[in-house]
UniProtKB/Swiss-Prot annotation:
Cofactors, names only: Mg(2+); Mn(2+)
Keyword annotations: Allosteric enzyme, Magnesium, Manganese, Metal-binding, Mitochondrion, NAD, Oxidoreductase, Phosphoprotein, RNA-binding, Transit peptide, Tricarboxylic acid cycle
Top-level taxonomic group: Eukaryota
GO CC annotation terms, alphabetical: isocitrate dehydrogenase complex (NAD+); mitochondrial matrix; mitochondrion
Gene Ontology MF annotations: isocitrate dehydrogenase (NAD+) activity; magnesium ion binding; NAD binding; RNA binding
Full protein name: Isocitrate dehydrogenase [NAD] subunit 2, mitochondrial
Source species: Saccharomyces cerevisiae (strain ATCC 204508 / S288c) (Baker's yeast)
Annotated catalysed reactions: D-threo-isocitrate + NAD(+) = 2-oxoglutarate + CO2 + NADH
Residues involved in substrate binding: 119, 129, 150, 237
Gene: IDH2
Other noteworthy facts: Present with 43100 molecules/cell in log phase SD medium.
Site positions for Critical for catalysis: 157, 204
Activity regulation (UniProt): Allosterically regulated by several compounds including AMP, NAD(+), and citrate.
InterPro entries in the record: IsoCit/isopropylmalate_DH_CS, Isocitrate_DH_NAD, IsoPropMal-DH-like_dom
Length: 369
């Protein structure tokens, strides 16, 4: 009885999108001969192959109708810039969806973030970061339930910077109406889909009057198309103060913000909800293509030691399954993962003050499917 109650309470916990937002919907079809969907899998670097193996084992045990297509995004140089290899681009473009482990950006002149390169290549304009407390895993804050949507393609991450003269560097924050409208409209649609009545635009237009001012003004214009939702605006510094003092004030809202603010706030939210990025899923949404990823790093210091926590990638795969409409399989895996974590330190990895290995955690999840 207790187990069933836990399952009901955690159902569709991280990405409640049984009703899909009207933007960025998955349109892929299963293979007629196998009845399975093909998903590109970027295993990543460092601990990536280990946590990817965990996902594959659990999906196999759960009989999820998915065939994995391995995808190598090791960067190549074209005209001096980091580029994704053509086979990887073709795979993801064909399959419309990918699951991605952590990537390490090579060190050296000309290399830019591989995550940024993927977002640019596939037009992944919205980064969806849910953060919610896990029942049975005690952290400083309880009952955290936050959803943040980050603009994913421009802002301070546009890569436009140069040396003006020795000792002076200029970095450009690029904000455009098109990109702002894209992500804000998605935030409205997402809020409507998951039943949250408020959309909060986080900004600093008191200082960045033109850049953030444009972002806020676009939101105000779009809000007229969503009379059933309430638009609020909030200064970034005030938002940080409020969320750490009273995160429950945001349980009925979806926050949306420009790129840099979203990068910082999303990790803050993860700290409030779980105390670890090892539990945090993420979705990168484009109009046609979406990539789901663990947001933590590649952790080369523990790679190959059977110590890595696969939870973030597993919960990202749950987000992916919901996105694809495979909600029963999503619920099955999600509930198994969360009940495993709640069962005690013997089934938690070291980053959660537990004693489990990657392998033993994986087997514990499979037993709970």
């Amino acid at each position: 009885m207790l187990r069933n109650t836990f399952f009901r309470n955690t159902s569709r916990r991280f990405l409640a999108t049984v009703k899909q937002p009207s933007i960025g919907r998955y349109t892929g079809k299963p293979n007629p001969s196998t009845g399975k969907y093909t998903v590109s899998f970027i295993e990543g670097d460092g601990i990536g192959p280990e946590i990817s193996k965990s996902v594959k084992k659990i999906f196999s045990a759960a009989n999820v109708p998915i065939e994995w297509e391995s995808c190598d995004v090791s960067p190549i140089f074209v005209n001096g810039l980091t580029t994704i290899p053509d086979p990887a681009v073709q795979s993801i473009t064909k399959n419309l969806v990918a699951l991605k482990g952590p990537l390490a950006t090579p060190i050296g002149k000309g290399h830019r973030s591989l995550n940024l390169t993927l977002r640019k290549t596939f037009g992944l304009f919205a980064n969806v970061r849910p953060a919610k407390s896990i029942e049975g895993f005690k952290t400083t804050y309880e009952n955290v339930d936050l959803v943040l949507i980050r603009e994913n393609t421009e802002g301070e991450y546009s890569g436009i910077e140069h040396i003006v003269c020795p000792g002076v560097v200029q970095s450009i924050k690029l904000i455009t109406r098109d990109a702002s409208e894209r992500v804000i409209r998605y935030a409205f649609e997402y809020a409507r889909a998951i039943g949250r009545p408020r959309v909060i635009v986080v900004h600093k237009s008191t200082i960045q009057r033109l850049a953030d001012g444009l972002f806020v003004n676009v939101a105000k214009e779009l809000s007229k198309e969503y009379p059933d939702l309430t638009l609020e605006t909030e200064l970034i510094d005030n938002s940080v103060l409020k969320v750490v003092t009273n995160p429950s004030a945001y349980t009925d809202a979806v926050s949306v913000c420009p790129n840099l603010y979203g990068d910082i706030l999303s990790d803050l939210n993860s700290g409030l909800s779980a105390g670890s990025l090892g539990l945090t899923p993420s979705a990168n949404i484009g109009h046609k293509i979406s990539i789901f990823e663990a947001v933590h790093g590649s952790a080369p210091d523990i790679a190959g030691q059977d110590k890595a926590n696969p939870t973030a990638l597993l919960l990202s795969s749950v987000m992916m399954l919901n996105h694809m409409g495979l909600t029963n399989h999503a619920d099955q895996i999600q509930n198994a993962v969360l009940s495993t974590i709640a069962s005690g330190p013997e089934n938690r990895t070291g980053d959660l003050a537990g004693t489990a290995t990657t392998s033993s955690f994986t087997e514990a999840v499979i037993k709970r499917l």
